[in-house]
C-alpha cells in the first residue's frame, strides 16, 4: 500500500508540473497565430502607439526589446526627457566641494504642472514629494525611493494593469478559449491573446527600434526635423538607446546640439543615471524588506558631472 501511495504521489506531482507548464500564460500570443522576428522587421520611422509612452513601454517590454532589469529606469528616464522638453522641469548645473570642485545637477520642478494621464501625474507627484520647495537633488530622490519602495513598485504594477485594461477595451487584446493537450485530454483554457491591431503595433514598435538603432541610415535621419528628434529621443530613452541615437545625430546633423531642447549638458547620461540609481535604491530597500527577493532591478553607479496618453 505504501508503494502504491508513493507511485500515486509521484504521478500527481508530474501531472501538476505538466499542467503548470502547459497552461502557463507567459509570452505573447497573437490571435492570428503569427510570430515576430524583431530584428527582421522593416525599420519604421514614425512613433508608434499614437505616441502613448505607457503603451509603447508595455509592448516593448512584452516583446523583450527591453528586459525587466532596465525597463523601469528606462521609463522614468523617458518621462524626465519629456518633462524637460515640455519645460516642466529644468536641470541646472552646480559645483560642490571646497577644494576639489565636482559638478552636480539639481532638478527644478514646476510644482503647479498638470497632466491628463493619472499615472504620469502620480509619477510627477513622487518627484514633488521628494523635492524641497520644488528643487530635487539626485541623492534626495534616491533616499525617497529607498524609503517608499512600495509606492514605486505599486506605481509600476498600476501602469501595467491600466495598460492591459485599456488594451482589452480598445481592441488590442481579448480573452479566448484555447485547447491544450495534457496527457490523454484536450483541456479548455482561457487566456489573453493579442489581436491583429496589437500585432500591427508590435511590428511598428520593433520597426521603430530598428530604425533608431540602425547606423546605416544617417541620410534618412538627417532629413528629420530636430524638434521631432527631441520627441523621438523620449521613446529612445524608453528603449534604453537614447545615448547611442544621440551620437548618431551628432554625425547626421552637425548643428544638432545647437538647436535641440536638450543642449545644455550631458542630459541623456544624467537622466539615465538618475533613474538607474533611484530604481536601484528602491530595489535594495525592497530586497532588504523582503528577505532578499524583489521585483526591482539591481545595479549601482553614481553620477556627478563630467562629460558625456491612453490607448486609442
What is the role of each PLM region?
Residues 1-312:
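Acidic, Ser/Thr/Pro-rich intrinsically disordered cytosolic tails and loops
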Amino acid at each position: 500500500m505504501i508503494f502504491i501511495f508513493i507511485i500515486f504521489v509521484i504521478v500527481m506531482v508530474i501531472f501538476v508540473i505538466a499542467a503548470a507548464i502547459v497552461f502557463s500564460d507567459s509570452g505573447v500570443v497573437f490571435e492570428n497565430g503569427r510570430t515576430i522576428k524583431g530584428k527582421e522587421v522593416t525599420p519604421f520611422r514614425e512613433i508608434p502607439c499614437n505616441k502613448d509612452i505607457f503603451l509603447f513601454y508595455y509592448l516593448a517590454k512584452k516583446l523583450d526589446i527591453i528586459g525587466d532589469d532596465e525597463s523601469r529606469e528606462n521609463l522614468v528616464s523617458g518621462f524626465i526627457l519629456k518633462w524637460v522638453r515640455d519645460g516642466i522641469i529644468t536641470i541646472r548645473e552646480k559645483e560642490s566641494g571646497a577644494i576639489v570642485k565636482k559638478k552636480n545637477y539639481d532638478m527644478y520642478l514646476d510644482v503647479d504642472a498638470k497632466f491628463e494621464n493619472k499615472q504620469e501625474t502620480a509619477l510627477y507627484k513622487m518627484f514633488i514629494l521628494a523635492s524641497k520647495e520644488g528643487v530635487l537633488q539626485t541623492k534626495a530622490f534616491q533616499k525617497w525611493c529607498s524609503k517608499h519602495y512600495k509606492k514605486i513598485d505599486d506605481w509600476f504594477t498600476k501602469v501595467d494593469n491600466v495598460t492591459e485594461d485599456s488594451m482589452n477595451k480598445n481592441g488590442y487584446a481579448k480573452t479566448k478559449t484555447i485547447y491544450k493537450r495534457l496527457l490523454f485530454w484536450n483541456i479548455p483554457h482561457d487566456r489573453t491573446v493579442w489581436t491583429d491591431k496589437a500585432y500591427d503595433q508590435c511590428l511598428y514598435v520593433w520597426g521603430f527600434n530598428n530604425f533608431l538603432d540602425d547606423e546605416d541610415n544617417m541620410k534618412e535621419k538627417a532629413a528629420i526635423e530636430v524638434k521631432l528628434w527631441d520627441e523621438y529621443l523620449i521613446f529612445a530613452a524608453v528603449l534604453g538607446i537614447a545615448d547611442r541615437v544621440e551620437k548618431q545625430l551628432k554625425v547626421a546633423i552637425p548643428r544638432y546640439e545647437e538647436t535641440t531642447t536638450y543642449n545644455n549638458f550631458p542630459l541623456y547620461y544624467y537622466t539615465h543615471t538618475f533613474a538607474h540609481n533611484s530604481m536601484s535604491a528602491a530595489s535594495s530597500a525592497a530586497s532588504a524588506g523582503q528577505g532578499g527577493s524583489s521585483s526591482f532591478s539591481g545595479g549601482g553607479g553614481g553620477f556627478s558631472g563630467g562629460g558625456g496618453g491612453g490607448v486609442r
